[in-house]
UniProtKB/Swiss-Prot annotation:
This is Cytochrome c oxidase assembly factor 1. GO terms for cellular component: mitochondrial inner membrane; mitochondrial membrane; mitochondrion. Present with 1680 molecules/cell in log phase SD medium. Keywords: Membrane, Mitochondrion, Mitochondrion inner membrane, Transmembrane, Transmembrane helix. The chain crosses the membrane at residues 74-94. The gene is COA1.
């Protein structure tokens, strides 16, 4: 009976009242945490003491001099330019050596009796890296090339091909197609009825 009377005397706690109490508790906790953080920051700032209060706080370190090692940068740029130029030259030369005009020229040279008499069999490009000098532009109709060949007789020959045309509808007009080796110049136009172009 006494327990029942005490229970009746207590105020009823509604859900909204309980929620309000929880919100107040969380706000008080956040305020206390923020106050402690601000106090710690203030203590850390108080510990910083400037040697010269008239001068601003800065890092006492010399900045790098942009003019130093200028020669190294120039040398590196020159080496880079030479490497790029060499790579482009190799690419363009490879396109020339793989051209059908060069392949047809070598085909007719290998079948030339006069050329085989001087150079021998197995006629190929001379040198470790095949190189075609001059202009080889069939689109614009300009061909003026020179390259070196060699056979199994270890005699080096020079091939020269000069031709041009005015329009795409015309055929190439060959001005010179020859092989020079051992002091002799062989006219391939006189030997062949067909041309490499």
């Amino acid at each position: 009976m006494m327990l029942r009377l005490v229970t009746k005397g207590l105020p009823k706690v509604t859900p909204s009242a309980a929620k309000a109490v929880l919100v107040r508790g969380s706000l008080l906790h956040s305020f206390s945490t923020s106050a402690r953080f601000n106090n710690s920051v203030a203590e850390d700032e108080a510990k910083i003491v400037l040697k010269d209060k008239n001068r601003p706080l800065r890092i006492d370190r010399e900045l790098p001099d942009p003019t130093t090692e200028r020669r190294k940068r120039i040398a590196g740029f020159l080496l880079f330019s030479v490497a790029i130029g060499s790579a482009l030259s190799l690419i363009f030369n490879y396109e020339k050596t793989e051209s059908p005009i060069i392949s047809n020229t070598l085909y007719y040279i290998r079948r030339s009796p006069a050329t085989k008499n001087i150079l021998g069999e197995s006629i190929e490009f001379d040198g470790i890296i095949p190189w075609v000098y001059g202009e080889l532009n069939s689109v614009k109709g300009r061909i003026n090339i020179t390259f070196y060949i060699k056979g199994d007789k270890n005699v080096t020959g020079t091939v020269r091909l000069v031709a041009d045309r005015n329009t795409h509808d015309e055929e190439f007009l060959i001005h010179e197609w020859s092989v020079t080796a051992a002091g002799q110049k062989i006219d391939l136009l006189a030997e062949n009825t067909k041309t490499p172009i």
